């Protein structure tokens, strides 16, 4: 709720004391091959939007947006500003999904695990307007936490409550909102923050040691600044709904990150919320093992499909013929008897062999939990509600 107090004063950012990179160096969002200065809004630290949101520092960047910690001068609190490149479909879709989610009246606890939209507006740009979204400020992504962890593996003390929190959110998303996220991955799940001391520290550090940057005329590219990890980290929030879908029982087309693609995506089978369950399995494996389950990355998505399928066969066994009959692209990779026809070799391995972070009963319990998600047939994957009651996730 908006405060009745007078607006907070604006902070003046430092005008010196920062390192400036040579313009030949590509920094952060510039490293994407599709980056276009004309399609990007270059936020400047200290800039105020809508006469109320002052940018304090850069939190991160993605393929179509940048994220900034801001101070809401009217509400006297920290928020996150997400600024999209001009004219990208994800911006419109993300706002549409958030507004739809707001219309759902429910007491489901999973609502707390879904990022909410506080405000939205547009900024003018050279190639059209830039959509901007204002959210509650959140902490690090699970990917950032993994990178900071020993051996890039997240401890079960954190991973289990994080995963359970995500599954509760997905139960709401799938059963009450009937939304398929389609892009669940470690970069789209973030820590909920109860104490804004972390944001105060971020703000003060930016004042004391201003971020490295690149200055090219009126265009400034900043290096992102990391947030601290709270002592009471246990709750996470699912974010980034730019590719989410709702309004149908089944969908078609290419979705999901390359390395997380479910069988129905590569085989051309109509998909539903069970692709999110597959993705949770991929993400939990990444965080627990410190490595990807699927590794093949070739220049194009289609080029990597045979290797992706070969890896699936190695880890899950051959797909049921009944499933292949549902696939638009199945005959490209399999004969009518379900034999894999690609030249790509199927490794002699298994999930049991590749799981290296536990042993004994712990390993058995983890793999049982994982296999509730990593299944060829979508209907054989467990629901989010079934998974959140799994023994592995509830035994500390």
Pin down the residues of each PLM region.
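Intrinsically disordered, low-complexity regulatory segments of kinases
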Residues: 1-396
């Amino acid at each position: 709720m908006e405060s009745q107090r007078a607006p907070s004063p604006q902070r003046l950012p430092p005008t010196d004391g920062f390192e400036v990179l040579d313009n030949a160096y590509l920094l952060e969002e510039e490293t994407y091959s599709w980056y276009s200065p004309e399609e990007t809004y270059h936020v400047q630290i200290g800039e105020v939007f809508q006469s109320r949101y002052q940018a304090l520092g850069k939190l991160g960047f993605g393929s179509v947006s940048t994220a900034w910690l801001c101070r809401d001068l009217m509400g006297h609190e920290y928020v996150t500003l997400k600024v999209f490149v001009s004219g990208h479909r994800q911006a419109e879709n993300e706002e549409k999904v958030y507004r739809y989610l707001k219309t759902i009246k429910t007491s489901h606890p999973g609502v707390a695990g879904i990022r909410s939209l506080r405000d939205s507006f547009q900024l003018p740009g050279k190639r059209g307007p830039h959509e901007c979204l204002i959210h509650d400020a959140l902490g690090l992504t699970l990917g950032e936490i993994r990178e900071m962890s020993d051996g890039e593996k997240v401890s079960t003390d954190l991973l289990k409550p994080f995963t359970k929190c995500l599954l509760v959110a997905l139960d709401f998303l799938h059963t009450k909102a009937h939304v398929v996220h389609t892009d669940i991955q470690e970069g789209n799940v973030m820590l909920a923050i109860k104490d804004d001391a972390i944001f105060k520290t971020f703000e003060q550090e930016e004042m004391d040691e201003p971020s490295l940057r690149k200055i090219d005329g009126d265009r400034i590219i900043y290096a992102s600044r990391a947030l601290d990890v709270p002592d009471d980290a246990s709750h996470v929030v699912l974010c980034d709904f730019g590719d989410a879908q709702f309004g149908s029982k089944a969908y078609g087309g290419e979705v999901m990150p390359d390395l997380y693609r479910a069988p129905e995506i590569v085989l051309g089978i109509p998909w539903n919320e069970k692709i999110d369950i597959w993705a949770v399995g991929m993400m939990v494996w990444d965080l627990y093992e410190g490595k990807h389950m699927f590794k093949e990355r070739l220049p194009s998505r289609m080029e990597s499909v045979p290797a992706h399928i070969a890896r699936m066969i190695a880890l899950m066994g051959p797909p049921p013929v009944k499933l292949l009959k549902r696939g638009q692209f199945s005959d490209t990779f399999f004969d009518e008897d379900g034999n894999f026809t690609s030249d790509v070799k199927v490794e002699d391995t298994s999930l049991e062999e590749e799981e290296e972070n536990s042993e004994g009963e712990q390993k058995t319990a983890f793999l049982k939990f994982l296999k509730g998600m990593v299944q060829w047939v979508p209907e054989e994957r467990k629901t989010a509600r079934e998974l959140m009651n799994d023994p592995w996730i509830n035994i500390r």
